[in-house]
């Protein structure tokens, strides 16, 4: 179960409806929905404006990311000190 059972949530819902009223809750819900919609629209327009133009050269961004480097040498084992508590 958890901290709150379904009965607890029902009591909390009834108290909230009694305190604020259904009209105020409906208005609050629509205001929150409009705010979320506006936020998503703003994020989408910012992404479109900040997106750089595609490079016109023959190489793509993926070519530069996939280049690998080989490191020459040998691995050495390092002894870690033992803690004495």
Swiss-Prot record:
One of its GO terms (biological process) is protein transport by the Tat complex. Its main location: membrane. It comes from the Bacteria. It comes from Azotobacter vinelandii (strain DJ / ATCC BAA-1303). Pfam families: TatA_B_E. Disulfide bonds: none annotated. Residues 56-73 have a biased composition (Polar residues). Keywords: Cell inner membrane, Cell membrane, Membrane, Protein transport, Translocation, Transmembrane, Transmembrane helix, Transport. It is a single-pass membrane protein. Belongs to the TatA/E family. One of its GO terms (molecular function) is protein transmembrane transporter activity. Residues 43-85 are annotated as: Disordered. The chain crosses the membrane at residues 1-21. Gene3D superfamilies: 1.20.5.3310. InterPro entries: TatA/B/E, TatA/E. This is Sec-independent protein translocase protein TatA. GO terms for cellular component: TAT protein transport complex. It is found in: Cell inner membrane. Part of the twin-arginine translocation (Tat) system that transports large folded proteins containing a characteristic twin-arginine motif in their signal peptide across membranes. TatA could form the protein-conducting channel of the Tat system. The Tat system comprises two distinct complexes: a TatABC complex, containing multiple copies of TatA, TatB and TatC subunits, and a separate TatA complex, containing only TatA subunits. Substrates initially bind to the TatABC complex, which probably triggers association of the separate TatA complex to form the active translocon.
